[in-house]
């Protein structure tokens, strides 16, 4: 047994010391950062891989805002892949492999495709895959005969463009012909791509969106540590997942190291995020195993009780600082996961060495989270829960089994999370705007124009509990 001599600190133990600054406006400050060495973000915020935080809608909103969402793993492989594909199909400049049907297919066929893929229009081709028409939801609106051939209901004489048509030319063609979809074809008239008005408008509305190399929204997905998870990884990567997050509470474990090594060997190009750890040694082990980024945080989350139940963890500021000290030398980003309650905490985490922060409860109350709405005493809330809570574990076992969980299994489980509710907060876009604005204010007080500068220039001062109370509104009635 030994006791470490240093006092471990968390965000409420410190403040950033204001410094002489030449920053004129916080709006000019850059919040660009990296999730992994190959994935750039415009804001350093990641939505947590929790089943009350991130599914399709949250992932889309996060990517559009310049961050990224990590779709949780507590669903079937097929459903998780479907969620990823929905994100990928939400917007893109060119749809490289557009959906198509043949002119000999039926109205029933196209309706099934539209329902399965959330697509509003399907290109129709002949037996040689040459474009001959297009069917949109408008064409199907009053069509009652599901057996009719698409050749009878499709819009013919479709306007097309060459495969190499750029965005400017495509926009001009769409405007000239007053159409919403522009199929791209090769010299033989065969379908090679698709450009839509909807996607062009989204490009302009979200200029800082996080995109992959093909112009699609970026998204991550979580997996477990069982060897069978390699199949899940394969399917997720095939669907276009940009980052694989290995998701267990105690990441500094043999199981985690082995699964990261296996993924790296099987899928060398995959971007792998390991976690969670709370020490420099744990961080280094995951880096040595092949992790491209490391998630730091054992027990700081608002719905996590690991430190109470297991007596294990490291206060989050110290955990981030010590982990970043080893990771930054190797160009590996740190994700500070948990304990973030305010924009000031985001600034402190980045100053301590984190490249991004992962948020759970702060985002669980938004429109885009999959949590259930509840009303209590006239106020609206959404459900939030730790993924190690009793109910989350019961639900997980029910999904993995035959839908039933034995009383013995329930009694044997020791919960390290709680089920809770958080106030309804409206759109995640507004929550992110407030957080990023506060972060930029913190940067200005430390004379930092970039997040890297914030880390380099930051000076922390410790404070007493009285200092913390002084930091909050006091001696007044807050309206």
Which residues fall in each region the model found?
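Catalytic cores of alpha/beta
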Residues: 57-60, 231-239, 278-296, 336, ...
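Active-site-adjacent beta->alpha loops and helix N-cap segments on the catalytic face
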Residues: 75-85, 143, 147, 190-210, ...
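Glycine-rich phosphate-binding active-site loops on the catalytic face of alpha/beta enzymes
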Residues: 64-79, 241-253, 292-310, 340-374
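Bateman/CBS regulatory modules and CBS-like beta-alpha motifs in cytosolic regions of diverse proteins
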Residues: 25-42, 48-50, 79-119, 124-126, ...
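Catalytic beta/alpha-barrel core
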Residues: 71-74, 100-101, 121-123, 160-162, ...
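Alpha/beta catalytic cores of nucleotide-metabolism and tRNA/nucleoside-modifying enzymes
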Residues: 1-22, 162, 222, 289, ...
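Terminal amphipathic helices with adjacent charged low-complexity linkers/tails
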Residues: 73-87, 124, 128-143, 174, ...
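Short beta-strand/loop segments at the ligand-binding rim of alpha/beta enzyme cores
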Residues: 40-46, 93-98, 212-222, 263-278, ...
């Amino acid at each position: 047994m030994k006791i470490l001599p240093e006092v471990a600190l968390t965000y409420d133990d410190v403040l950033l010391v204001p410094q002489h600054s030449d920053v004129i406006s916080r709006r000019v400050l850059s919040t660009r950062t990296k999730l992994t060495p190959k994935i750039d973000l415009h804001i350093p915020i990641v939505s947590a891989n929790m089943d009350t935080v991130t599914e399709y809608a949250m992932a889309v909103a996060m990517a559009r805002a310049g961050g990224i969402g990590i779709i949780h793993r507590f669903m079937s492989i097929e459903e998780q892949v479907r969620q990823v594909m929905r994100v990928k199909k939400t917007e893109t400049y060119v749809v490289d492999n557009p959906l198509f049907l043949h002119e000999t297919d039926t109205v029933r066929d196209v309706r099934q495709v539209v329902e399965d893929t959330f697509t509003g229009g399907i290109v129709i081709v002949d037996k040689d895959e040459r474009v001959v028409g297009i069917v949109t939801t408008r064409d199907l609106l009053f069509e009652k005969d599901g057996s009719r051939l698409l050749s009878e209901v499709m819009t013919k004489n479709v306007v097309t463009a060459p495969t190499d048509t750029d965005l400017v030319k495509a926009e001009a063609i769409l405007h000239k012909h007053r159409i919403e979809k522009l199929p791209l074809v090769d010299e033989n008239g065969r379908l090679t791509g698709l450009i839509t008005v909807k996607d062009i408008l989204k490009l302009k509305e979200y200029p800082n969106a996080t995109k992959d190399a093909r112009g699609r929204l970026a998204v991550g997905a979580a997996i477990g540590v069982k060897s069978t998870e390699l199949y899940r990884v394969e399917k997720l990567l095939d669907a276009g997942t940009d980052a694989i997050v290995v998701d267990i509470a105690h990441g500094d474990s043999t199981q985690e190291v082995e699964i990261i090594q296996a993924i790296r060997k099987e899928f060398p190009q995959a971007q792998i995020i390991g976690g969670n750890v709370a020490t420099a040694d744990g961080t280094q082990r995951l880096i040595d195993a092949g992790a491209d980024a490391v998630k730091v945080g054992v027990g700081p989350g608002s719905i996590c009780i690991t430190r109470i139940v297991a007596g294990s963890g490291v206060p989050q500021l110290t955990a981030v600082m010590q982990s970043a000290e080893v990771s930054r030398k190797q160009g590996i980003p740190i994700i500070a996961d948990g304990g973030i309650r305010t924009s000031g905490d985001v600034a402190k985490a980045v100053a301590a060495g984190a490249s991004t922060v992962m948020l759970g409860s702060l985002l669980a109350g938004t429109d885009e989270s999959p949590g259930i709405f509840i009303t209590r005493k006239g106020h609206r809330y959404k459900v939030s829960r730790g993924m190690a809570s009793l109910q989350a574990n019961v639900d997980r076992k029910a999904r993995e089994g035959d839908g039933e969980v034995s009383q013995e299994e329930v009694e044997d489980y020791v919960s390290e999370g709680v089920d809770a509710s958080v106030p309804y907060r409206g759109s995640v876009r507004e929550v992110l705007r407030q957080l990023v604005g506060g972060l930029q204010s913190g940067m200005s007080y430390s004379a930092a124009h970039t997040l890297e500068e914030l880390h380099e220039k930051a000076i922390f001062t410790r404070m007493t509990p009285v200092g913390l109370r002084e930091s909050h509104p006091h001696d007044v009635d807050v309206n």
